[in-house]
Amino acid sequence: MEAAPGTAAAAAKPAKSCKKYRMGKRHANIYTYQEPPHSNSDEDISEEKADSQDPEQVFQNIQYQKEVMSNIRCRPWPMRQKLRVLRQAKEIVLKYEGRLTRTRGYQAAGAELWRKFLRLAYNFVVLFIPWEMRIKKIESHFGSGVASYFIFLRWLFGINIVLTIMTGAFVVLPELLAGAPFGSTVSKTIRQEDLKTAQDLDTIWSLGGYLQYSVLFYGYYGSDRKIGKAGYRLPLAYFLVGMAVFAYSFIILLKKMAKNSRMSLASASDENYTFCWRLFCAWDYLIGNPEAAESKAAAIVNSIREAILEEQEKKKSKNLAVTISLRIIANILVLLSLTGSIYIIYFVVDRSQKLENNKRELTLWEKNEVSVVVSLITMIAPSAFELVAALEMYHPRTTLRFQLARVLVLYLGNLYSLIIALLDKVNSMSVTNSIYSIYQVSNNSTPSSATGTPAKEDTLSATISDAQMNSSESHAQSLPTAGSLVNNTASSNSAQNQCWETYVGQEMLKLSIIDMIFTVASILLIDFFRGLCVRYLSDCWCWDLESKFPEYGEFKIAENVLHLVYNQGMIWMGAFFSPCLPAFNVLKLIGLMYLRSWAVLTCNVPHQQVFRASRSNNFYLAMLLFMLFLCMLPTIFAIARYKPSLSCGPFSGQEKIYDIVSETIQNDFPAWFNSVIAYISSPVVVLPALLLLFMLIYYLQSIARSLKFTNNQLRMKIQAERTEDKKKVVQMAVGQNLVDIPDDQIMSDFTQNSEGTRFQSLDGSDKRPDKDGGLISQESSVRASTPRKNGSVLNFESPVSKGTRIQTISQTVPHAVPSTDVARPVNTTPTTSASLTPAPSVSSAQKPRNDHTTNRYPSVVHGSASELCKTKPYTPVTFKKRIGDVHSEPLFRKSIRQVNPDAFGAGAPVFVGRRPHATRYFIVNENEPRKKSARSTSRLQRQFRIEEPEDIVELYPCNVRRYVVQTPQCMYSPHPSEDEEDEEALGRHYVKRSHRPRSLSDLRPAPRFYIGDRADGHVLTSKVHYKSWDDGFELDLDRPPYAYKKVHLKNVEADQHYLEPQVKPKTKHMLEQSLTESDSVSIESSSDPQNSSNDQYIQVIHSKEKYLKPGTKLTKKKSNTNIELNMSEPNELVCSNV
């Protein structure tokens, strides 16, 4: 049976590195070409060999490729493979030979240095990421949910840094450097009455005095269109920077959300192999710090806890009616809380305005009651929401999102109620400014001491001080109105106090300061002092304070995240009226980072329900985007609705704040540009542009929906495939396929047609394996690891196809099988006869055919087809231990030279080169002489395969050239078992005796492993080193022959243990006789000698190489070069079931 010529390159072999290739070149005269296990082409190896940038390695690779090109004719490869390797070698030489020049070498060295510099620079920049190690430490102990808060805080810190640079560089610094100095104008001068209390704590706390007339607020900036020698347009810059703050915030938020969305779509789902990935792939082997290792271990434990909670939440059963009722009650309570908080804030703001109108001097509480009440509601309400959320019984992540949404609504309600009350105050101040402007006009037309007579119609009586005379007397002006009479009494110098933009900025900054104070107080009271009480009073208290009330504090993710959103909303809302508010927020966030991180690591404990946070944190960003939009609306409304103050600010004298843009275009730009801007801002252009934008948004949204749908379909497909793989693995693990197969079907599969390149599946259909990938695909499953009762077939398969496989399957045959059924002695001359074809089923029996088929090698028949077909069903083999721990030594491959065949007799192992590629089964009857060449049956089905043999060494008769075996160092167990001690004792007994090889007929049968590439070859079951006699091999006489290799089967224990027999030297003319007497000069049955005739084997041989030419005799096989041995991987040892 001859294999196809291309099958030699089909099976994948173990990959070798470039270094191993070069070592093989030095120690061998012919270079072997092997492919990596997962590659079917030679390009990967060539690129791997030639990709090195080292000139020395490039030179060695080029020399190697040139040697390959020169010796390509001598290699036993198919022509297609030779042409492919030759073409690739030429390409590599042409591509990399130019690198050996001096210029190319300098360029390569410079490029390598530049890459190293960039890598070092990147590592250096990473060191400057703020608070990275602190956040990693928190994440390792408290999980990704708590760490997401600090990551979000750091990101907000970066945004505020940019906002501070924008306002500072374009607004604050130009005003300080080129604007009017302090005290030069009315808006920058403190009244004489206020100088006495300007430095009092009460005044500073209310942001009055010197703070009011500083760059912190809007009123300090001058209204000059151009300042300094360069003519810097400060009013225009103030307006554009105010708008740029909102634009930049929108852009950076949307960009971050888009990036996170792409990352979440590109990332794999964590629902598959959750615990395996965390258990086996989570450790970072680059950790060299004990503290970092401890943090990483804590992080792995936390991630496993998160995964366990995820699985528990999926399986939790719920009562639908009770759950819906509780959720309705919880939402009603939340709505009542929100309504009450909004009413309280509006009530406090209205009361504060009345007190300001009625009382001349306000107390400290009356000045700050609005900010204090807002901060108290902000601190208390989230805890109430958390108690309500416990009724809903949502998943922890869903609970967090509901909690975030409710707290967000609370904060927005607080801010909007505050801003509405402030806008009412702004409206009244705008009315006062209008009255003051009317008074100025009328005062210019009449003497200052004149008193107007009120008319009979409704009049507006206003008492306004004369700012020009700086006196305390009041002048009554009668102004006709269509409404009611309003009396507004203003103190002296009221024009300076009626700057509503400064008032809004003061309220926002005051609210931020008080919020920071309450945050620090809550951390100290709720976390620190609470932790101290629990820690030191738990021993002397009536109950356990750690497990019951008050317990240690837990880090509330929803409350703290929304607090950051609320704080940033205040900054956006007041940034236009207080340019230094982002700078203050930077300092606040720095303090909050250190204080919160210290409190978490010192005072808090991890949440009882640790859960995984969202990987992208897009929910946080979506809330922040929503807050940005809602906080931008009041500012835009105030800019568009109210007239700017007349006596303060850069827009004084303008009808609207945004008029500064049109004024600048009219005065500072040419006329054609003004006309273009007017045309672009007309409805003729604006409306079509808006329609086009809407259509574009709809189109992009449609594409996004379709891509999202496709992504979900692909994700479901991947998940389905993984589920199928899991099912297959489970079925293979329990041996479901093998258990369900009846015995007669197994026998019919063992007796298929003997075509080497075809195999028949269980459904009867013939299938030809693929030339390249068939072997790998056929070997890719893992079978049952325990013996089955319907046949002693142990199936262990490696996922990678190996070059040579031998599998032995044992079964019990009846005692009445006559010895005449066994084949006759070997006839070394091929004859023309039909091959041994076993019957296709158990019921069909035929006579054994002892003749040879032409073009077939002489081999030994281990049994006949009739014996196989007449056997009883499989009987289980009793193992005392599993076949799991089979120790073997590393695989060493050396060149082998020819030695004298009679140097050590026939017992010495004989090795030949690679054998033909085919799958062959040999029926082995243990105590019967092997006389006839076996005929190959077809390849076994995948469910009947056994683990690949551990080591494969081929032994051949004396008429073939033989090579000497060098003994490796054996691996002994530090605690030998009783059987091993008996073997060692018997070994010491052998040392005292002569080391002359004995006849096999004098030895007791021993358990053997049938591993080999040919049926007529002798088999060694040990890992061996090969060394030629000329290289200095010396026989170790201190060890008995049986101890040259000791196979440690820790989990395999046969019914009886025997020593391996010594092999007696034979001459060439005694070959046939030795084969008859000693069962092919190798091994007898491994069971009891009395029942050894009942043991029958099917020896399965997979060989990768091509057949030799027809008619070639092994006795005339010459080897002019060193022969490469067919060795298997170290994980291919198979124990035969006896």
Curated annotation (Swiss-Prot):
Give its localization. Answer: Membrane
* Species this protein is from: Gallus gallus (Chicken)
What is the tissue localization of expression for this protein? Answer: Expressed in a range of tissues including cerebrum, cerebellum, retina, cochlea, lung, liver and heart. Also expressed in the apical, medial and basal portions of the basillar papilla.
Which protein are we looking at?
Transmembrane channel-like protein 3
Topology Cytoplasmic: residue spans: 1-155, 224-233, 349-369, 423-508, 591-618, 698-1138
Keywords on this record?
Glycoprotein, Membrane, Transmembrane, Transmembrane helix
Main localization is membrane
Listed under GO cellular component are: plasma membrane
**Where is this chain compositionally biased, Basic and acidic residues type?**
764-773
Instruction: List the biased-composition ranges (Basic residues).
Output: 989-998
Which residues face the membrane's Extracellular side? 177-202, 255-327, 391-401, 530-569, 640-676
Region (Disordered) location: 1-20, 29-54, 753-859, 973-1005, 1065-1095
